[in-house]
Structure formats: C-alpha cells, structure tokens
Amino acid sequence: MSQEGFDKLKASCINSGLCVECGACELVCPKGAIKLQKYQWGRNPELSGSCGDQYCDKCFRVCPARSIPLSKIEKTFFGRTRKHCFPGKAGDFPTPNGEDKCGIYRNVYTGFALDKEIHENAVSGGITSALLIYALEHNIIDGAVLAGFDPATPYEAKAFVATTREDILRGAGSKYQPHPQLLGLRDAIKMGLKKIAITSTPCNALALRKMMLDDDFKEFTSCIKLIISNICGAHWSRHGTEWLITNGLNVRLEDVAELKYRARPFPGDFKVKLKSGKDAEAPFVNSLLGALGRFTPEECRVCLEKVASVADIVVGDTWHHPVLSPPLLMAYTDEEAAKDERIAYARKGMTAVVIRSEVGEEIFNAALSGQAIRAFKDSPEEARAFLEAVHDEGKPLCNGPVIEARIRRGQPVREYF
C-alpha cells in the first residue's frame, strides 16, 4: 500500500496544527480512504482504509493549510495579479500601499434584501440569502451548499444542500464553528446538480480555488458557479458553543431543539429554542462573543485570511466601516442620519459586500437590477478605508506575532506564491 501522499498531508498540514477541517482531502480521495474523525476538540483527517498501490497525493495538493498559488488564482479568476507585492510566508506583514491588505476587488457595497422575510431572517442585511434565492429563481444556479446544523445534534454545524427558497432561508445566518463544508459539494454532485453556489469561510475558499486550478479535480469543480465567503475573524470549536449553551444560558444540551447565534434584532442575540417550545437567549455580539475567544482552535490562530482574498463575493457586517460601523450608528444625531440614508438602514442591519470577480459582479448586478436587493456603493476612499481597517484591526494584530514565532522556531505556516 502506498500512502506517501497522505503521509505528506499528515506531516505538513495536520500534525503541524494547520488543518482547517474543510473536508477537501476526504472529498477528493479516490479510494475514499480519508475520513474526518470527530472529537470534542474538533475533527481530524485520518486514514480509515487503503490508499491503494499507486502513488497519489491528491489530498495534499488540495489542502489550503500550507501552500497557496495566489498569483495563479488571481490571474485565473480575477484577470490579473495584485499590484505591488503579496504575502510570502503568512507572517509577512503587508505593505501600507497597493493591494496587499485588500486584495483584488472591483467594488465595495453596503446593502440589504428588499424581501422582508429574507431580511428579517438574516444576521444583518440578508444579502447572501437574497443573491442565492435570486440566482436559484433565475436559473443561474440549481442549488447551493450552505452551512446549517446537524438534525441529530442541533448545535453542531454541518453542510447541507439547498435547492429551494425555503432551504436557503433555513441556512441563513453565521455558524461560528469549523466544519467540513466542502463535503456538501459531494452531496450536491450526488444529487445531480450542475450549477452550484457554495458559501464558505476564507480558508475553505482557498481549497476550492486550488481544486479549480487542477484538471484532476474537474469532477468536483466544473459545476461550481459562485463562491461566497464571509469576513472571518475566527471560528470557535464546537465545545465553545456547548459551553455557551450550558453556562451562558443554563440549558442542558439534550434539551436543545434549535440554535441561532445571532437572532434578531440586529446585531443579534444568542438564542436556543428548547424541545419544550420555550426560548432561552442572551446578547451575543456585546456579551457572549467575547467568551468564545477562549475556544479559538489552533489553525485560526495562525491565519491572516480575514477578507476572503479568493472568493467571488465577500460578505460581512459593517464593523470598521468609516461611516456605518455599529458603534457609530447609535451616536449619530437625527440631523446627521437624515443626511445619509444609509445610516437608518444600517441600524436595522446591512451587509458589507466586497465584489472581487467578474462572475460575482454579474450576479450581484443582476440581483440589483431585479430589485432583489438595495445597495449603496462605497466611494473609493470608503472602500479602501473599510478594507484596510478590517485587515489592520483583525488577524495581523492578534495572529501576526503567533505566526512570526512559528517561523522563528522553524514551524510551518501557510505560504503564498
């Protein structure tokens, strides 16, 4: 039996603490020999069968933990590479000029779904749900891989395939847990879907782009029409969510019927529906979110991918926006708010949207023209200020020293070339 490819993956990506639990290795293994085994602290790719007699390194080639051909990804999917330099080792701090901090982007917007049901069901503006429903109803896609919860364990994140408006609404809202989102792509293909949108974290999007560059993975990637990623500060291990339920809400896990990390009103409450029909909830963004930081997994502590540099469309809250950041919204006077209609809308929840690719721009503009969404285009100065602030106030500040320490000690980090 030859398992040299998996041995490379294990040594370089798994045992190094860099595995992001995306599921790409399990997805592409031609022998079905890799399984993400579940533990309390997370999932771990492990051999559950034979790799076969022939050399195969597909699992290693798709992994987003170590090696990212950023220049080739940008040239292929965005039409050019970013100006000036780009990160080499992930501990290299970007230069203050050029596109190092922001990546390649076409435009930045803030907006919300015009459909009241979609907006009220969302974390902020409902743009992701609105775009996917529009694309589905106009035959741009025939399904979407979304993050939901496992019916058997309703507080555990799990990928699922949405093929109806109702499915998409069921998948609305952030799921703050690492989970093998890319295994949902396998399910979508088995269902016979040919035009698939997939939502993912920035690190999962790296795996998708690596697969899309390699003809060996066409069976998985030829059907991908759109990648939407979220602005990501970190995800937190499942036992962090369990702690919030049992300690933050004083609810037994076996009593949980449904979970929302950020139920309305904006910016959102941590809400659990009990099997008894009762609800238990507490403020999330301004309270419980801080407690989750203690449960940040190792791989998130060595990541700088906050604004999803390789996705078609990036979505998130308006934190760090020069005009619409939530701390600013409540400080405006009525007179100030009357001068900028964005403020009133943002107080009810708006999504920040970064358009990176032509594909993303076409779908976004179609939904805008089709009155599925309302959007306000940031000025070039606002767009730049927003993206730089998201970058500067996030992962480089917290994770940069950790990454530099790993480099100094000869430990592997994610590298871009």
Predicted regions and their residues:
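Iron-sulfur cluster-binding cysteine motifs and their immediate structural context
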Residues: 2-6, 16-18, 24-44, 56-88, ...
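Short, intrinsically disordered, charge-biased short linear motifs at domain edges
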Residues: 4-9, 13-16, 45-51, 282-291
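Portal/gating segments that form or line small-molecule/metal binding sites
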Residues: 122, 127-136, 140-191
